[in-house]
Amino acid sequence: MDEKTKIYDITIIGGGPVGLFAAFYAGMRNASVKIIESLPQLGGQLSTLYPEKYIYDIPGYPSVRAQELVNNLIQQMKPFDPTVALEEAVQSVEKQVDGTFEIITKKDTHYSKAIIITAGNGAFEPRRLDLPEAEQYEGKNIHYFINDLSRFSGRRVAVCGGGDSAVDWALMLEKVASSVSIVHRRNAFRAHEHSVNNLEKSSIAIKTPFIPTEVLGNGDKLTHITLQEVKGDTTETLEIDDFIINYGFVSSLGPIKNWGLELERNSIIVNSKMETNIPGIYCAGDICTYDGKVKLIATGFGEAPTAVNNAMNFIDPKTRVQPMHSTSLFE
């Protein structure tokens, strides 16, 4: 059987942190594993949206940079050499007569005995700055992602938004930029209390309650933004080198909603085995829901082994759901 028609034990749809850990764990269970990821690189939102952000709620790490966590997860799964298919968005999943699954992407067709969906919040894109002239500066010095902090070294930066990402980005930029302003339409930020406390103690100029109403530039780059006080008459113009927008992201399940899975809002319903309503399809991470679900990376790390162990039992009912401890596997 060649690679095109090989039937894998477990195919993981979604190469974010939970998918990477699921691949490692499936490797420990001696499963043949394939990861299918729609983005050009592994890591999901951590690599694409927040590679420079620090994460503080991962067990064993007082803090860890998002991309560092992804790199460690990739390194962890490497001994088991899972097959990785990048830039392939899954369009459909069909159960075959023999009980295996046919997984069709825009590029290829894959086959698997079981599937674990770890697609996070599904397809996502940023909410954009809805102002005339803004679009022409996107990709120049209006940004929706921060992939490399060093590019802002010595520059005057304004960050727009009031959530965790906006506040965290502002705090990180303070260390490298010549000046940082944060613009939010409300007086109170929605970010974690600890981050807001750090913001208030920092040198960052806090512009609240203001919204941007105009962007000005020379056609090649943005040079100024005009701010308007919410429910007030005060206006202010900032001279800046970079404008970072964090209004959040719009996500959708995309084709997943057509796969016959039982859904609740934009999440896939699972039972205590992380099993969907379709036998052989499991979920882990933010994509799934159940009573009492908490959406954290740490939660997904716990769900992934449950999904893998039950998937292995589905493939071969003689296989133990409760595995040996990892300390005995690597001796």
Swiss-Prot record:
It comes from Listeria innocua serovar 6a (strain ATCC BAA-680 / CLIP 11262). Binds 1 FAD per subunit. Homodimer. It comes from the Bacteria. The keyword Transit peptide does not apply. This is Ferredoxin--NADP reductase 2. Its EC number is 1.18.1.2. InterPro entries: FAD/NAD-bd_sf, FAD/NAD-binding_dom, Fd--NADP_Rdtase_type_2, Ferredoxin-NADP_redctase_2. It catalyses: 2 reduced [2Fe-2S]-[ferredoxin] + NADP(+) + H(+) = 2 oxidized [2Fe-2S]-[ferredoxin] + NADPH. FAD binds at residues 37, 45, 50, 90, 124, 286, 327. Pfam families: Pyr_redox_2. Keywords: FAD, Flavoprotein, NADP, Oxidoreductase. Its cofactor is FAD. Belongs to the ferredoxin--NADP reductase type 2 family. GO terms for molecular function: ferredoxin-NADP+ reductase activity; flavin adenine dinucleotide binding; NADP binding. It is an enzyme of class 1 (oxidoreductase).
